[in-house]
């Protein structure tokens, strides 16, 4: 049986400006490269991805196209097809637009936040391979360090056992047919009763078992100025040894 193609959806359509810059955080630069570019390079370096669809807002399409063209990343780098697709107002809308843009009926789809710009390529491959081995939905996770409280307003309700908790990262991997079906049902349901905070929660709602694999501390999300300071410190000390693409 032939290998399923692997298509990555790279979410970069958000309007988040919590990093304090004038442009969406996906296009903020870290050591000379935008977060979206770093995430794209990690996908290419993983050696498991056949196509990358970058989800951008319509008003950022020209900016993204010029940036990635100048970097040589829109001309099938390393034999991987890379293209831009308009995202929606919410993350779920963007993912649905990306799923509709995939040409295949059967594939493995990886959904990744561009703000997780230091995600190791090996972790990307680990997620994709677990789906290829038969798991319909896979998420990378790391242990929770802090004690978590469930609250009602300002009152503590209970304290979940920290040993049972995990922080979830991306990329999350899925069988395309199952994820499409879950999205179709969600968007066709007038009141689904919840707002999915990630794609795995949508699959849980749809009744699909979600499998965990080991995540990586480097796959943290660059959201606030403090996150950016940490990312800058890491890349200042670690590059070019572990994050730069060989031969760059």
Swiss-Prot record:
Its EC number is 2.7.7.60. Belongs to the IspD/TarI cytidylyltransferase family. IspD subfamily. Pathway: Isoprenoid biosynthesis; isopentenyl diphosphate biosynthesis via DXP pathway; isopentenyl diphosphate from 1-deoxy-D-xylulose 5-phosphate: step 2/6. One of its GO terms (molecular function) is 2-C-methyl-D-erythritol 4-phosphate cytidylyltransferase activity. It is an enzyme of class 2 (transferase). It comes from Corynebacterium efficiens (strain DSM 44549 / YS-314 / AJ 12310 / JCM 11189 / NBRC 100395). This is 2-C-methyl-D-erythritol 4-phosphate cytidylyltransferase. It comes from the Bacteria. Catalyzes the formation of 4-diphosphocytidyl-2-C-methyl-D-erythritol from CTP and 2-C-methyl-D-erythritol 4-phosphate (MEP).
